[in-house]
């Protein structure tokens, strides 16, 4: 997701961060829901000897062991799908990075799981930001991320977790942020 463009006239920059509401999560939640429902109905059909699936004949399955195992796998899949839908509905990991010249603050905000730390919000003074660092590691498990180098705090991650950003988008976001904050861009 490209970040909004900051110009010299603007005093703030906000970058939205995609959390668990990614298309891949929707795909897996739907696939696991459909598969789990099918397995559970097949297991129930073999136990009740009533055809609950219109496109097959699960009543021909022996309940022990096939029907029982299919039912248990169906229950496990429905529990996993429930978790996926729960995480999607909460948008865990979603949020924004906001940088404001008027208030001289950088705010990193993310949604978490319910509880004491549902809202994760970290605020730094802009004067403590030393640089924007780009971290690129290629290979079997590539990593492409942006970090803020904050005085006395170490590196603070700015990019989403999961699918790595394309190099061009990562470079443009890093350059735009470094230009906006008037700090060096490291790692390229």
UniProtKB/Swiss-Prot annotation:
UniProt KW keywords: Membrane, Photosynthesis, Thylakoid, Transmembrane, Transmembrane helix
Domain of life: Bacteria
Disulfide bonds: none
Membrane topology: Multi-pass membrane protein
GO CC annotation, single: plasma membrane-derived thylakoid membrane
InterPro entries (UniProt xref): PSI_Ycf4_assembly
GO biological process, one term: photosynthesis
Transmembrane domains' residue ranges: 26-46, 68-88
Localisation per UniProt entry: Cellular thylakoid membrane
HAMAP family: Ycf4
Family of this protein: Belongs to the Ycf4 family.
Function: Seems to be required for the assembly of the photosystem I complex.
Entry protein name: Photosystem I assembly protein Ycf4
GN (gene name): ycf4
